[in-house]
């Protein structure tokens, strides 16, 4: 279905391939029906897609980048009609119905799908941040970033996009991690806020972000020093069922 075009640090970029799509479905129509039912069941029930039928958490970051929660195939179609050329999936490639349907929709509507793995409950690694920098420098055309709910990983990457690619102040970038997007900083997901908080005083003293990342930042220290709150973790993990 998809052909690997390029690999960045932790990133796989897939381009539409008509020939491989034909090969996948050739002579297996009955199997395709069963697979399609399974994929839609996983997307709607296991992945809580029914909650996203009318709630898309869709927001424009700037003229070239949008953020949202996990799109359905119909939303991929709508994005393509709006001029979106690249969809960045922050959940990484997965062997489940949601990923399969998204990948197939991207092939159908001529959208490039990028799989990039970001974490919502861990201090960002230096490798991930550099991978994000390379990704932002590589993608072409209007793009859409998404995770499952569009709250935490989408917020992290949106903030990095503004900080790294658009060279905005950390105070502006950090606004992408906000409750209005569904982000709860009192939970373990607050590690993402702590990451930007840790850089802010060094920015005030004139230190460039990547100088701080290379010479000062220690993800283990940040991880071990962060204290989340039990009620917030129960909300995010048990009630909202975030990844």
Regions found by a protein language model. Give the residues of each.
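Short cysteine clusters
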Residues: 147
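Substrate/cofactor-recognition hotspot
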Residues: 150
């Amino acid at each position: 279905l998809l052909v690997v075009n390029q690999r960045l640090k932790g990133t796989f970029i897939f381009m539409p391939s008509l020939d491989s799509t034909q090969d996948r479905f050739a002579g297996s129509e009955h199997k395709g029906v069963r697979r399609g039912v399974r994929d839609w069941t996983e997307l709607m029930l296991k992945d809580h897609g029914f909650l996203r039928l009318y709630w898309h958490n869709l927001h424009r970051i700037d003229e070239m980048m949008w953020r949202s929660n996990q799109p359905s195939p119909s939303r991929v179609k709508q994005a393509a009609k709006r001029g979106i050329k690249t969809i960045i999936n922050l959940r990484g490639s997965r062997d489940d119905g949601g990923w399969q349907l998204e990948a197939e929709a991207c092939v159908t509507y001529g959208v490039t799908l990028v799989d990039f793995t970001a974490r919502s409950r861990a201090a960002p690694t230096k490798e991930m941040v550099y991978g994000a920098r390379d990704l932002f420098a590589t993608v072409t055309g209007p793009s859409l970033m998404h995770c499952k709910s569009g709250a935490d990983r989408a917020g992290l990457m949106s903030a990095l996009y503004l900080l790294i690619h658009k060279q905005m102040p950390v105070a502006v970038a950090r606004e992408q991690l906000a409750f209005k997007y569904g982000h709860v900083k009192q939970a373990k997901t607050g590690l993402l806020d702590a990451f930007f908080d840790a850089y802010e005083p060094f920015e005030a003293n004139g230190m460039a972000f990547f100088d701080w990342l290379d010479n000062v930042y220690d993800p283990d220290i940040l991880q071990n020093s962060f204290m989340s709150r039990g009620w917030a973790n129960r909300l995010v993990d048990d009630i909202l069922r975030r990844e």
